[in-house]
Amino acid sequence: MRHRRKGRVLGRSPSHRKALLKNLTSALFLTERDAEYDENAPKVKGRIITTLHKAKEVRPLVEKCITIAKKSLPHAEEAKKYATQAERGTDAYKEWRKSDEWKKWAAARAPVVAAQRRVVQLIGDRQATSILFDTIAERFVDRPGGYTRILKLATPRLGDAGARAILEFVGKNDRVKRKAERPSFEDDASSQSEESAEEPVTAGAPAADSSEDDQ
């Protein structure tokens, strides 16, 4: 029995395993960066390829970070009410810093800052954290959970034949479900009634048949 043995060892020490999960989570978030002039741009945004066991192990950490960022979105929207459009260093910005609007903005922004610090503590990458809060979290506002999927790859990894898998965000590469068209029986019934109404009815035909039989 595997009592109190949650998780996978992955052939690493606890500190090495923790660093591995941090790097995988940051790598997935960083694929959503603006890589127009990046020489090492990701081939597909929102997707990384790793081993199957690593993907299963890092998925809960990715989901946890997204949930933390998503819960801070209402506070960020509340803080926008008291924000200023003035550039930093200008006289208007300095006046705003001394006003009560800045105090309200700082109070509304405090939960967002706490959430960002929590995610930085979990993954250790500030750039990935900013991408998570600015881009990824807004995508899953109406989704209660299940932000990622794992797709097994058919070809194993060269060298050790390890099972590979894709870890990606849902919503971008989803298959479109097409519903079959429902057959309409009302049109067929109406056409049959019209055909029966158009057929002529001859009352003398049965009488003629009976007379021929008597002969």
Where are these regions (language model features)?
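Short alpha-helical functional segments enriched in proximate histidine and acidic residues
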Residues: 27-28
